[in-house]
């Protein structure tokens, strides 16, 4: 992506075009087994074993990061693979809170589905951002945001005053919204591109 040219063919700051990411996203959606089905559970068991290189029955962050690149190949979608740390931390913390057990430093199989759900959600935010960022400069301006209101509402947002909401996103008052600012806002509102009925609620 870039500031000039079509969004689909231009390059952006992280070296991935919107078209590249869309193709990669369709593949990633298929390889993250987050559904509550017997078939998905079997796939999770197999995936967990591939991540668990030390065969300890629990995953360190290094193992998760390595698995996301070597097994899931998430780096084909975006170099922002570091966001796996957010999914890892949320899953292990929530798993321990829900079950009153688990490790503070590892994700066990009990929390593995939670982690995959969070991972999916974080990467889905990149898809949303690409849809709105029509200039392709990896920043949202007020006009882009206002134009995207119908799409944002389809994803679950409730926006009565686009200008006020944009100011809320633009925390530093720069006049533009970064991916991180958008991600924080969208995550808090649980926006969803594909209407997934099985998202993990924050209060779960």
Curated annotation (Swiss-Prot):
Residues binding Ca(2+) 1: 52, 54, 56, 58, 63
GO cellular component terms, A-Z: motile cilium
Annotated segments matching region Disordered: 1-21
Family: Belongs to the calflagin family.
Origin species: Trypanosoma rangeli
InterPro entries linked to this entry: Calflagin-bd, EF-hand-dom_pair, EF_Hand_1_Ca_BS, EF_hand_dom, FCABP_EF-hand
Protein name: Flagellar calcium-binding protein
Gene name for this UniProt entry: FCABP
Stretches assigned to the EF-hand domain: 39-74, 75-110, 120-155, 157-192
A Pfam cross-reference name: EF-hand_7
Keywords: Calcium, Cell projection, Cilium, Flagellum, Metal-binding, Repeat
Domain notes per entry: This protein has four EF-hand domains, three of which may be functional calcium-binding sites.
Main location: other
GO MF annotation list: calcium ion binding
Location of this chain's protein in the cell: Cell projection, Cilium, Flagellum
Physiological role: May contribute to the rapid motility of the trypanosomes, playing a role either in flagellar structure or in calcium metabolism. Could alternate between a GDP-bound inactive form to a calcium/GTP-bound active form.
Signal peptide: none
Record-listed Ca(2+) 2 binding positions: 133, 135, 137, 144
Residues noted as binding Ca(2+) 3 in the record, renumbered to the chain: 170, 172, 174, 176, 181
